[in-house]
Design a protein with these regions (language model features):
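Residue-level detector of Asp-centered blade-edge/turn motifs that repeat once per structural unit
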Residues: 6-8, 58-59, 112-113, 177-178
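Short loop/turn segments immediately following beta-strands, especially the blade-tip
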Residues: 135-147
Length: 378
């Protein structure tokens, strides 16, 4: 489902053929795949724990999508926007990866002539509609820093709510025509939670002026798309080398980044490399609780606050005195890292994961550094 054309004429789509199931339930997981236009050369490029949804192509050739991030986190607030290059390289946070708000960011669409996206903000345990916003990562990456409601334009409050954005008028599936006008599935009347509501297609602008285009008394109208020629997005060189089965990480300085605040340089001696192993089916449930909500881990490897997934330690690599590290890892695997001191104790752990494509070389400035941070001058 959710297929999109890529600049190199391949097709990116979402599929449950990865064969795993949701950590907190029994539903099949959907991940991102690529094939050519005839359906050949199909390969998986997202190796993600739960769903990756609603991929959209930006004008600069990047793909933005919703990714569920459950690794060592609660189950309610882990649905930020992620980004990747069209060949699957460069998978990284786009917005909200270390944030309580917005609860869920989904159904993104590119805004022509802009590096921003329009998206729907909603909760975790509610239907797939909510409030409409423009996301600007250049203004910030977390909470409400780079978020602006539209129709009308206003700044949202950063709140911590599960069923977010379900009061009043409801929005679904925006399609931006330019930086002020868009098509939208919309209902002005709202609904009572649990009661189906009917959507219609509107033209609308960011001030909230609107015109009804399509409506049906018996069924909702959703997912408008403009059928018109468009400029092919930027096509960068494909960096994937499928003759290889590894990739390389370069870390410039592990002490850079908000999560390492207060850690004395020289404390971290090694990085532990851990692979997440997902499950094909639920085998029971361990109930955990925390600030991120309850956690129903259906692949229990312990009791009480059990881990979502099995963790396989691949090894450890040295961290140099200047905080740098350079190491090779298996490609096409979900990996996360733990910073260790001289006693092998964990100083900080990564509550997400990273995946490299074959032959990919990926660099980072620090440990959970702000994504708007430039390289450190040496």
């Amino acid at each position: 489902i959710e297929g999109i054309y890529l600049p190199d004429d391949n097709i990116l789509f979402n599929s449950t053929r990865c064969g795993t199931s949701v950590d907190c339930w029994f539903t099949e997981v959907s991940n991102l795949f690529i094939c050519d236009r005839s359906g050949k050369y199909m390969r998986q490029i997202g190796f993600d724990q739960v769903h990756t949804l609603h991929p959209v192509l930006l004008e600069d050739g990047r793909v933005v999508y919703t990714r569920w991030d459950y690794n060592d986190r609660g189950q309610i607030f882990p649905q930020p926007l992620f980004q990747m290059n069209f060949d699957g390289t460069g998978q990284a946070e786009y917005y909200g990866g270390n944030s309580w708000f917005p609860t869920t960011i989904t159904q993104p669409c590119a805004i022509p002539g802009s590096r921003k996206v329009m998206a729907v903000l909603m909760g975790h345990h509610n239907p797939q509609h909510g409030k409409l916003a423009i996301i600007d990562p250049e203004a910030g990456r977390d909470e409400n820093e780079g978020v602006m409601f539209v129709a009308p334009v206003r700044k949202p409050e950063a709140v911590r709510v599960d069923g977010y954005g379900q009061e009043g008028e409801q929005f679904q599936h925006p399609f931006a025509l330019n930086q002020t006008d868009f098509l939208i599935s919309y209902t002005p009347l709202g609904y009572n939670i649990g009661t189906p509501i009917e959507f219609a297609i509107y033209w609308m602008n960011i001030d909230g002026e609107r015109e009804l285009l399509v409506a049906d008394s018996k069924i909702s109208c959703n997912q408008p798309v403009l059928v018109a020629p468009r400029r092919r997005p930027f096509q960068r060189v494909n960096m994937v080398d499928y003759t290889k089965n590894t990739g390389i990480y370069y870390l410039q300085n592990i002490y850079e980044g908000r999560s390492m605040k207060g850690v004395t340089p020289g404390t971290v001696k090694k990085l532990r490399i851990v692979e997440l192993e997902y499950r094909a089916a639920g085998v029971g449930c361990a109930y955990g609780h925390g600030k991120g909500g309850g956690g129903h881990a259906f692949s229990p490897v312990g009791v009480g606050n059990a881990s979502w997934d099995l963790k396989k330690v691949l090894g450890e690599v040295d961290v140099e005195p200047d905080g740098s590290a350079f190491f090779e890892v298996p490609s096409r695997k979900p990996l996360y890292f733990q910073a260790l001191d001289e006693n092998g104790h964990v100083v900080q752990t990564m509550r997400s994961w990273s995946t490299l494509q074959p032959g990919e070389i990926q660099s980072c400035v620090g440990c959970h550094e702000h994504k708007n941070l430039s390289l450190i001058h040496i």
